[in-house]
């Protein structure tokens, strides 16, 4: 049974999953648009939106929380200086998932996740 599961396992161990989602969050913030599978995009959305919300708070504690997860000062600076001010008036929903096609090798559903 799958009751009360608040995240997808993505077929990986916890440390691998966390590292993958961290790297995908960094890629999304840098490029503002990446292509991945639908389930990864849905899981990535949670982390990306949390980082942008930290940026909107713009406190020392929120900057440290963002850095504790991302471990990349350049990306944290981009969140706080460029991305968060764009979403000052928006309450959540900073990302958009657009389903595209299926991957040729394994027919996995692909999607583009981008910042709105």
From Swiss-Prot:
> What domain of life?
Bacteria
Cellular component (GO) terms are: cytosolic large ribosomal subunit
Q: Write out the GO MF terms.
A: structural constituent of ribosome
Alphabetized, the UniProt keywords read: Ribonucleoprotein, Ribosomal protein
According to its UniProt entry, one GO biological process term is:
translation
Q: Which InterPro entries does the UniProt entry name for this protein? A: Ribosomal_bL17, Ribosomal_bL17_CS, Ribosomal_bL17_sf
Under the heading PROSITE patterns, the entry gives:
RIBOSOMAL_L17 (PS01167)
**A Pfam family matched in the record:** Ribosomal_L17
Q: State the family it belongs to.
A: Belongs to the bacterial ribosomal protein bL17 family.
Instruction: Tell me the subunit arrangement.
Output: Part of the 50S ribosomal subunit. Contacts protein L32.
Under PANTHER family, the record lists:
LARGE RIBOSOMAL SUBUNIT PROTEIN BL17M (PTHR14413:SF16), RIBOSOMAL PROTEIN L17 (PTHR14413)
Can you name this protein?
A: Large ribosomal subunit protein bL17
Question: Organism source for this protein?
Answer: Fusobacterium nucleatum subsp. nucleatum (strain ATCC 25586 / DSM 15643 / BCRC 10681 / CIP 101130 / JCM 8532 / KCTC 2640 / LMG 13131 / VPI 4355)
